[in-house]
A protein has these predicted regions:
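Phosphate-binding site recognition
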Residues: 1-416, 431-434
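Domain-level recognition of nuclease-like catalytic cores that cleave nucleotide substrates
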Residues: 487, 492-518
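Structural motif
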Residues: 151, 460-462, 495
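A short, contiguous, amphipathic alpha-helix enriched in charged residues
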Residues: 121-122, 421-431, 483
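Mg2+/Mn2+-dependent nuclease catalytic core
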Residues: 171-176, 468-486
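Conserved catalytic cores of phosphodiester-cleaving nucleases, focusing on short active-site segments
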Residues: 424, 448-452, 460-468, 482
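Short secondary-structure junctions
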Residues: 428-436, 489-491
Length: 518
């Protein structure tokens, strides 16, 4: 069998169960099952790649299929403890299609879709021999003729849209094919579909409007089943002590459930625990490049928003999702919305943020692109800025800051503390290679503006305090009075950096080195 009651989802789900790092999401089955054979049987869940869509799709396919006995896969999972566990276990015909799978030597949409349709027709003819007595003009006719009902598990339904050989007409044909196959068909018990971007990205009207769609911005029903929450990650850390929770949180946290609970990137957490080290496991570069191209045009100040978020400043915005029209990356809201859907930004309580250190590294590369003009030029001098700071060259640090100010880039004008923070972030961007830079972190008796925590033992830590209209000496004194050095007192050397901006004197800098004797 190719798609009908195939053992493919069972084999794939078994592999995940065999993994030492597995989080039980089986209660999703209970949520989905109540919509079988109802008017609400069309469910589409869109999430960024790496957020567990395929694992859950294989789990559902394994549970529902009547092609194989799968109790052994589920008897130790949470779903086995529910009252409905046996009601749908191995009771349904399941058509499981992973649309990201391509046939060999596939060079056109025709090759792609013919392979899927031929495989499914082959399955139906084998499973229902009486269908061989008649010719059919469509797959839906064959399915009706079986007089059976089916659960459709359609994983990565939108993957074909990323292929270069697909034309606009091909996309239209594909949407109409899905409509004919699924919409208002008596043989559909359940249609569970997953993808990356919302249906509205591809469908201009009512073709697939039977689906109830749940994405990163509007899902308060299934959100707990995609990604790892705080408790799940803490439990994984107890079982696998290769990486501590705090490091995982810094690298891969930063998304939110509707109730404010934190959500982690599951694939990256898995990889870090498996390898015993936190690294950048984000591999999805295509959409990031597409969005970076849009940012470069500075559409409605999107580029300015990105610089602010790199500086750790949340950006206030109203995002309404994609329920109305096809997504075009032309406006600020459209670009920022797409970045949330792709997982490049997190959105909660009206504010956008760069979720974590893993993605921060990606944005730093975006800011270094040639087309960012003056922003790139500032970033290019950030190595020089770090070297001047470590060399205690107060004059050079002040001179570099003065040069940035003299450029008169609109969103870097010193009309508030956030603008000054953006300048500092850009000027010290290179330092992120060697330091974890924390902004407004609790240390000692208060909150300091910036702490540069060395990634390697033996490096010099940096405490940076900003002042506007005061003096750099006052900034240094505040670091001492508030004991901001407490968080990095384990370091042998600490640089205290006080920076002041005054409309008359402009920039001044004072640097003092503290050596901790062991």
């Amino acid at each position: 069998m190719n798609y009908l009651n195939t053992n493919t989802p069972l084999l794939l789900f078994q592999k995940n169960l065999n993994s030492e790092i597995y989080v039980d999401k089986s209660l999703l089955i209970e949520k989905i099952s109540k919509y079988i054979n109802t008017g609400d049987c069309y469910i589409c869940i869109t999430r960024p790649r790496r957020f567990g869509k395929t694992i859950n799709a294989t789990m559902l396919g394994s549970y529902y299929t009547k092609g194989y006995e799968s109790h052994k896969l589920f008897h130790n999972l949470s779903i086995a403890g529910t009252k409905m566990y046996e009601k749908h276990l191995n009771q349904h015909n399941v058509i499981y299609i992973d649309f990201s799978r391509m046939p060999d030597f596939c060079n056109s949409y025709c090759d792609y879709i013919t392979n899927i349709l031929s495989g499914l027709k082959e399955d139906l003819l084998e499973y229902y021999p009486h269908l061989k007595k008649k010719e059919y003009t469509s797959l839906s006719q064959m399915l009706k003729e079986t007089t059976d009902t089916f659960i459709f598990i359609l994983d990565e339904w939108d993957s074909i849209f990323y292929k270069k050989f697909v034309t606009i007409d091909d996309k239209t044909d594909y949407i109409l094919l899905l409509k004919e196959l699924l919409k208002d068909q008596p043989y559909v018990e359940l249609a569970y579909m997953t993808g990356v971007l919302p249906i509205a990205k591809y469908s201009s009207g009512s073709e697939l409007n039977m689906f109830h769609e749940y994405n990163f911005m509007n899902d308060c029903i299934y959100e707990e089943f995609f990604g790892f929450n705080e408790d799940e990650v803490k439990n994984l850390c107890l079982k696998h002590n290769s990486v501590n929770y705090e490091d995982l949180q810094k690298w891969y946290d930063g998304y939110y459930l509707s109730n404010g609970t934190h959500l982690f990137n599951p694939r990256s957490v898995h990889a870090a625990l498996r390898d015993g080290v936190c690294l950048n496991y984000w591999t999805e570069t295509g959409p990031m490049n597409e969005i970076a191209d849009c940012i470069e045009h500075n559409v409605d100040e999107v580029r300015d928003d990105i610089v602010k978020m790199v500086a750790g400043i949340p950006v206030e915005v109203e995002l309404n999702g994609y329920s109305a029209a096809e997504l075009e990356l032309n406006t600020r809201d459209e670009i920022l919305s797409a970045m949330v859907v792709y997982g490049f930004l997190s959105y909660y309580d009206g504010y956008l943020r760069i979720p974590n250190h893993e993605l921060m590294e990606k944005y730093q590369k975006v800011l270094s692109r040639d087309s960012f003009g003056e922003v790139k030029e500032i970033v290019d001098r950030s190595k020089e800025m770090l070297e001047a700071t470590l060399a205690e060259d107060e004059h050079k640090v002040a001179t570099i800051l003065e040069a940035v100010h003299d450029r008169e880039i609109p969103f870097l004008k010193y009309n508030d503390e956030n603008a000054l923070s953006c300048v500092i972030t850009l000027c010290y961007l290179y330092a992120r290679k060697d330091y974890v830079i924390e902004r407004e972190e609790k240390s000692g008796k208060g909150y300091c503006d910036y702490i540069f925590i060395p990634k390697k033992k033996g490096q010099t830590a940096i405490i940076l305090e900003l002042k506007v209209g005061h003096s750099s000496e006052e900034a240094l004194q505040q670091i001492k009075d508030k004991n901001y050095t407490q968080k990095v007192e384990h370091c042998n050397e600490i640089l205290l950096v006080g920076i002041n901006y005054d409309k008359k004197k402009h920039h001044e800098c004072k640097i003092e080195r503290i050596t901790n004797r062991e």
